[in-house]
């Protein structure tokens, strides 16, 4: 019976590639006015890493627009390494949920990215990335599901399921809860969320 406070990230890649057919072509002009909505937190997973690295005009326009509104830009950069990863992060993409192993995640953490540890229906990375939930890295880690089927949500749960699984893997309960609530709220600048304390919702 608690109120649900839904927040949104604007789509960064519709269509996902120039070869795809979709119901629309959302360039920066199509999404720019939505940044003023109070529930919009930023630009969703920037899948076109090639466009970021090579300064594709449409991609750069979307990044610049998000930054002009002081919004977050979430990443989607599997297997991006070295100078390509440096360029991607330097463009302002400060998170990633596509880490499959510790080396990938640590390389991104070392470059200043936040890691969204994913445990969804198809992609499940919690077991591989649970060692990040330690004093050295936990402040820059949070949980996400990415894609999760409705039946899994009903049967297993959402972020609460990831918390339980993290604890079963040996993560300290307070650390798991912090990654689920506090860290995500801090990342998205939701300053009165993510804690059970006076003044928090």
Segments (PLM) and residue ranges:
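Divalent-metal coordination cores built from histidine and acidic residues
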Residues: 1-70, 136
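His/Asp/Glu-enriched, well-ordered alpha-helical/loop segment
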Residues: 132-201
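Structural recognition of alpha->loop->beta junctions
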Residues: 28-42, 88-107, 138-142, 171-172
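Short acidic, glycine/serine/threonine-rich loops at helix termini
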Residues: 17-23, 54-58, 84-88, 107-110, ...
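Hydrophobic faces of well-ordered beta-strands that scaffold small-molecule active sites
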Residues: 6-10, 41-45, 73-75, 95-97, ...
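Phosphate/diphosphate-binding loops
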Residues: 6-8, 121, 190
């Amino acid at each position: 019976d608690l109120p649900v406070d839904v927040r949104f990230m604007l789509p960064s890649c519709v269509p996902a590639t120039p070869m795809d057919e979709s119901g629309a072509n959302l360039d920066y002009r199509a999404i720019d006015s939505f940044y003023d909505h109070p529930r919009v937190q930023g630009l969703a997973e920037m899948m076109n890493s090639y466009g970021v690295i090579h300064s594709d005009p449409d991609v750069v326009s979307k990044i610049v627009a998000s930054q002009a509104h002081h919004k977050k830009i979430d990443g989607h950069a599997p297997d991006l390494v070295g100078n390509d990863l440096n360029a991607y992060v330097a463009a302002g993409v400060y998170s990633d949920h596509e880490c499959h192993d510790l080396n990938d995640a640590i390389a991104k953490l070392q470059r200043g990215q936040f890691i969204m540890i994913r445990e969804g229906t198809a992609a499940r990375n919690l077991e591989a990335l649970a060692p990040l939930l330690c004093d050295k890295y936990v402040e820059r880690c949070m949980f996400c599901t990415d894609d999760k089927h409705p039946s899994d949500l009903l049967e297993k749960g959402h972020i609460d399921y990831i918390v339980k699984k993290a604890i079963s893997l040996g993560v300290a309960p307070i650390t798991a809860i912090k990654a689920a609530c506090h860290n995500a709220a801090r990342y998205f600048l939701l300053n009165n969320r993510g804690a059970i304390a006076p003044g928090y919702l």
